Design a protein with these regions (language model features):
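Interfacial segments of alpha-helical transmembrane regions
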Residues: 71-110, 203
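Hydrophobic alpha-helical transmembrane segments
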Residues: 60-80, 150-153
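Membrane-water interface at transmembrane helix exits
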Residues: 39, 43, 73-77, 105-114, ...
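Membrane-embedded catalytic cores of phosphoryl/pyrophosphoryl-handling enzymes
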Residues: 2, 132-237
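Alpha-helical transmembrane segments of integral membrane proteins
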Residues: 9-10, 89-98, 169-172, 193-197
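Membrane-interface helix-loop-helix junctions at transmembrane boundaries of multi-pass membrane enzymes
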Residues: 2-6, 80-92, 162, 166-168
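Aromatic-anchored segments of alpha-helical transmembrane domains
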Residues: 17-22, 99-104, 177-188
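N-terminal transmembrane-helix/juxtamembrane module of multi-pass inner/ER membrane proteins
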Residues: 1-71, 110-140, 228-237
Length: 237
């Protein structure tokens, strides 16, 4: 019997209900006005403020994705530096399991969710596009934006940080998620619901089976025992 089965099932139900609240209604029901209002709010700001235009352009440049990796790496590094050699190895392996989980859930989400939709910049007409207002390389559109894969990866990171390093670290990771995921919404490359519905659906249905069961711990232990190297956490067991 899985110890946290009631919590897992509840989170799965919430995730499914969240998705169906968006998927079943005609034109996505109450979600579409929310999506449209958020898009038009930020889209109008692009021509009202040059500073905002540049902010959105730069935070959607591919180099900014590297900054998100740096932020995640620095947070993990702060714990890695405090550990002894076996503990450092275990943190690295935890990162490997986190990456593996992100890849699997992202692929499952893309394959199983029966949705394909273009970003708001490719849906609405008579709008402002950063790529037309500035000559800066930036991502302001997507032909298939649902679910938001970038937001999903950052949410998985946040959940792993919460699970293995505590609530405060999890909250810091959530700040990283907001800072690096929502510029995609501000520029119009993603709908708000690509993240709040799409990414969250995959997270609520898939991730509890990894983090609220022994699976993640067992994977970490397996890789610790199997991968070459010194300072294995379980080498004397």
């Amino acid at each position: 019997m899985i110890k946290n089965l009631p919590q897992i099932v509840l989170l799965n139900i919430v995730g499914l209900a969240l998705f169906l609240s968006w998927y079943i209604p005609v034109n996505h029901g109450f979600w579409l006005p929310i999506d449209a209002d958020i898009f038009y709010f930020f889209n109008q700001k692009l021509v009202e403020s040059k500073a905002f235009l540049w902010l959105v352009a730069l935070t959607n440049n591919h180099a900014f994705d590297g900054c998100s990796l740096l932020a995640m790496g620095m947070l993990m590094l702060s714990f890695w530096l405090k550990e002894n050699a076996p503990g450092r190895r275990r943190i690295v392996i935890m990162g490997l399991v986190m990456l593996l989980t992100a890849v699997v859930l992202n692929q499952l989400g893309q394959a199983l969710i029966p949705v394909k939709r273009a970003s708001p910049t490719l849906t609405f007409t008579d709008i402002n596009r950063v790529s037309e207002l500035l000559s800066v390389p930036t991502k302001d559109a997507s032909r298939d934006s649902f679910p938001g894969d970038h937001g999903m990866m950052l949410l998985i990171f946040s959940a792993f940080m919460w699970r293995y390093f505590g609530k405060v670290t999890g909250l810091i990771a959530l700040i990283i998620f907001v800072v690096f995921a929502f510029p995609r919404v501000m520029i119009g490359a993603h709908w708000f619901t690509d993240i709040i519905v799409g990414s969250m659906t995959v997270i609520l249905i898939g991730l509890p089976w990894v983090l609220l069961t022994p699976l993640s711990d067992r994977l970490i232990t397996f890789f610790d025992k199997s991968l070459p190297g010194k300072n294995k956490h379980f080498q004397n067991k």
